[in-house]
Amino acid sequence: ASDVYKRQLTYDKFACNQYLKGFGVRIAESLLLRGGQSVTDEDVMEKIGLPCFIKPSLGGSSFGVTKVTAKEQIQPAITKAFAEAQEVLVEAFMDGTEITCGCYKTKDKSVVFPITEVVSHNEYFDYEAKYNGASDEITPARISDDLTRRVQTLTSAIYDILGAYGIIRVDYIITEGEKINLLEVNTTPGMTATSFIPQQVRAAGMEMKDVMTDIIENKFRD
């Protein structure tokens, strides 16, 4: 795939996940609805099942996301998601531990940060949990050394597959049997003091300014 195509991919959750699935990355079952396209409650129940998440396919910040637990919630959730974006994703719910891992690469090194475990006080990691502190973020995550290595290796591989530049953050959910399932790739992760990447940089014993300098200097090298 061309670099332009891969960069466009990362802005579209559905397309990006489907692309990575072709490389053997595990993802949730999902349906994509475009431009007001409708789907019956029965189709959602049969193809995806409940509970499920209905959310905009483009963008971040968890706006317009609904966790659907009953049939009568499906259509209102689709309407809510379409108010935020032209494409809507209906995605199977996966029960497990949510984690996230950051990574950046320069011409002479690859840096994969310690993993953060996300424990939301809400039913899922929504806008309130993400921005208003309604979650516990534990870095490094309380997972085995073997699983940590596997997640970091996969994060590095995803970076390469997508031809990423600068810092990316990859969100996963770990399901029974330590199975690693991709949630989404963030190519423009938050950089505020409480965001995941600065937490991971600190946990790695690094300084954010040094990381940014590294990336900027790398850009200007031949």
Predicted segments with their positions:
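Short, small-residue-biased leader/transition segments that mark boundaries at the very start
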Residues: 1-5
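Glycine-rich phosphate/pyrophosphate-binding beta-alpha loops
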Residues: 62, 118-121, 186-200
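Conserved metal-phosphate-binding beta-hairpin within the catalytic cores
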Residues: 92, 102-103, 159-191, 201
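Phosphate-binding site of ATP-dependent enzymes
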Residues: 69-153, 174, 179-181
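Active-site nucleotide/adenylate-binding loops and adjacent lid/helix of ATP-dependent enzymes
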Residues: 8-96
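Active-site "cap" helix and flanking loop/linker of ATP-utilizing ligase/carboxylase catalytic domains
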Residues: 117-168, 199-222
